Amino acid sequence: MSPSVILLLSVCVYLAIGVPVAFALGLSTVTALLVSGSFPMLVLLKETFTGIDSFPLMAVPFFILAAELMSGGSLTEVLLKFAGQFVGHKRGGLGYTNVVALTFFSGISGSALADAAGPGSMMIKMMDKAGYDRPYAAALTASTAIVGPIIPPSIIMIIYALADDNVSVGALFVAGLIPGLLIAAAMCVVNWYISKKRNYKGDGQMPTGPEMLKTTWQALPAILLPVLILGGMRAGWFTPTEASVVAVFYALICGKYIYRTLEWKAVPDILSRSALLTASVLLIIGMSASFAWILTIEGVPQSMANWITSIHLNAWTFLIVINVFLLLFGIFIEPLPGVMVLVPILAPVAAKIGVDPIHFAMVVIFNLTLGMITPPVGGLLFVTSNVSKVPLTELTRELKPFLIAHGIVLVLLTFVPALSNWLPHAMGFK
């Protein structure tokens, strides 16, 4: 039996018995090496280290730290107030506020789980007190939180660029803007429909002009973080890795000296949380790298490319097949290891049959992220269920219209490549 077959069978077994993803990838690599005897065990250590020995990867801990610092500076309350002033007075206003606030927060956190656990949990409580059904509030939060990995800066996009040499971090950051806003717009449409159907009321009166200017001025430093990152990269002031360091200093200044809510005594806890999250990310990346190395050495990507060529799939048919596969795969595997394992295999195949690399990247990232809210085992569902105290069955029932909306967005992203690649190409990214 070939090492690649042993590898794939063993990882399925380990995942089925509940082994965490990072350890399942590592253990399956060990199993393949031991049973096949084709490679020395040193491969595991070498490829694991090689997988995390990357300069662009240094951006990950700094973006994580920047998000923690901004959250520690009570950014959530500022963004909720800013978002609410524009849409809070409308029918279903708190639902719109939820979507807008989470979209803005995505430009800081880059994480769906952070969005759901942070501002999302606050919005669920606010919506519950205002008379919204709590399961609906939780479903709206989970469905909107997946904007986190789409809106820049996104950790998943950094990892994707590491796995595919044909795209840059900057190009992916810019490529995520239109799809991210499209997802947010789709969630607003669903909220409009449900709010009208259930007669959810607005939240008070629209604020006056001076009040709106004051709130906007307060939120401006936080809103400018993604602009600073993308603008600085486009102007050539700094690379994505350097941008992450700039983001940390900017977040520190905002939290300590602008919003004045970040205390020095809280910094050690913030550093500790950031270090733990970074360690978990790097562990997954390292284990995924050794896993993917065996598949590559065994010629799995080339074999798949040859097979697809032999059955004469065109680019559109290929994308349809990939969508189905990734949706199923994303239900059981989180986006981060999914990108590390699948992209080295699928990206060369997509390029060979003429799919634009940036377009393909957005299709892959959105599919895997969508798996986080797809029953029965979407990871984001469990987080949202936990913070909202809503049973998973009730949360799942409320998800149906949101999943339909996400499906429509996925179809648009798949068959309208310009939604993904027009802006990066227009800004000079390749």
Model-derived regions, located:
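Alpha-helical transmembrane segments of multi-pass membrane transport proteins
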Residues: M1-K430
